[in-house]
Amino acid sequence: MTNIRKSHPLMKIVNNAFIDLPAPPNISSWWNFGSLLGVCLILQILTGLFLAMHYTSDTTTAFSSVTHICRDVNYGWIIRYMHANGASMFFICLYMHVGRGLYYGSYTFLETWNIGVILLITVMATAFMGYVLPWGQMSFWGATVITNLLSAIPYIGTNLVEWIWGGFSVDKATLTRFFAFHFILPFIIAAIAMVHLLFLHETGSNNPTGVSSDVDKIPFHPYYTIKDTLGALLLILALMLLVLFAPDLLGDPDNYTPANPLNTPPHIKPEWYFLFAYAILRSIPNKLGGVLALAFSILILILIPLLHTSKQRSMMFRPLSQCLFWTLVADLLTLTWIGGQPVEHPYTTIGQLASIMYFLLILVLMPTAGTVENKLLKW
């Protein structure tokens, strides 16, 4: 008799994806972030569902409903803070996952990589809309500033912004539609993630060496199920430490003030995970130029496979490229810091230099390093 997990139509899919899947024997902890992103997504959908049961998407009651969740709903405070800080964990895992892909050359799996970029953009859009929902000062002004960027698009810009707002300013219509989109998008993300996984399983996982591991595979279960479970436990531990000891560490105090269209906060800034892109946007004095730079700072990921010049896939044995990779990481941290600072000297200059460096590293220096390394190895 055939094992049910190999014969049942549904179980067969699960079996081929999570149990009998042939996996490289040498993938490190950097390969844990894919499953951790899955854990984050499930956690966000569950906590979000319970929050949606008590939340009202009306400008007059949205702020009060969030306060009500924290004060009157049983364990509402923990659900709210798990959801808010869960987003931060989500982005930490996302950036680590993308960084791993860049370092080890996983972007040569073109379909998987491009679906991943689409996922990244969708998650960013979802997080942005979620930040608007509590209807605090930073929610309102963040929504106003970011949606207003679209008005830089020639000819159709103003109409586009008013169409997104559903009126002449960020108001009730905007909040309602943002809530609707914020609710539906995680399920769309889950569906796209399935496609991401489907394309990955067409080729099999990459590994730290960047060399094909077809000659030597091990089953996913029990080796990587155990490893992923440990990763998930550590992730939940980190999240709960944040939620229970410093729930507001990554938030903005301005969001505890109800939204007021007549009073602008002194420093409008997004959540920490968008600060690098916000710094790039602010570093260009021209509105349209800033918007294009902002868009390109994320969309540049699509070009990465085209910019790969090395004859080796991974950076594991490429010290020159490694130096540039970690310079890029430092540059992104610098941009994140600058994005949270006021627009004044010396921050503006540092931001402009870091922005130039960001594009220079990806578009010029890293491809050049790949070519130089080929020459050094006489390839």
Curated annotation (Swiss-Prot):
PANTHER family: CYTOCHROME B. The chain crosses the membrane at residues 33-53, 77-98, 113-133, 178-198, 226-246, 288-308, 320-340, 347-367. InterPro entries: Cyt_b/b6_C, Cyt_b/b6_C_sf, Cyt_b/b6_N, Cytb/b6-like_sf, Cytochrome_b, Cytochrome_b_C_euk/bac, Cytochrome_b_N_euk/bac, Di-haem_cyt_TM. The keyword NAD does not apply. Component of the ubiquinol-cytochrome c reductase complex (complex III or cytochrome b-c1 complex) that is part of the mitochondrial respiratory chain. The b-c1 complex mediates electron transfer from ubiquinol to cytochrome c. Contributes to the generation of a proton gradient across the mitochondrial membrane that is then used for ATP synthesis. Binds 2 heme b groups non-covalently. GO terms for biological process: mitochondrial electron transport, ubiquinol to cytochrome c. GO terms for cellular component: mitochondrial inner membrane; respiratory chain complex III. A ubiquinone binds at H201. Heme b b566 binds at H97, H196. It is a multi-pass membrane protein. It holds the Pfam family Cytochrom_B_C. This is Cytochrome b. It is found in: Mitochondrion inner membrane. GO terms for molecular function: metal ion binding; ubiquinol-cytochrome-c reductase activity. Keywords: Electron transport, Heme, Iron, Membrane, Metal-binding, Mitochondrion, Mitochondrion inner membrane, Respiratory chain, Transmembrane, Transmembrane helix, Transport, Ubiquinone. It comes from Bos sauveli (Kouprey). Heme b b562 binds at H83, H182. The cytochrome bc1 complex contains 11 subunits: 3 respiratory subunits (MT-CYB, CYC1 and UQCRFS1), 2 core proteins (UQCRC1 and UQCRC2) and 6 low-molecular weight proteins (UQCRH/QCR6, UQCRB/QCR7, UQCRQ/QCR8, UQCR10/QCR9, UQCR11/QCR10 and a cleavage product of UQCRFS1). This cytochrome bc1 complex then forms a dimer. Its main location: mitochondrion. Its cofactor is heme b. Heme 1 (or BL or b562) is low-potential and absorbs at about 562 nm, and heme 2 (or BH or b566) is high-potential and absorbs at about 566 nm. Belongs to the cytochrome b family. SUPFAM superfamilies: a domain/subunit of cytochrome bc1 complex (Ubiquinol-cytochrome c reductase) (SSF81648), Transmembrane di-heme cytochromes (SSF81342).
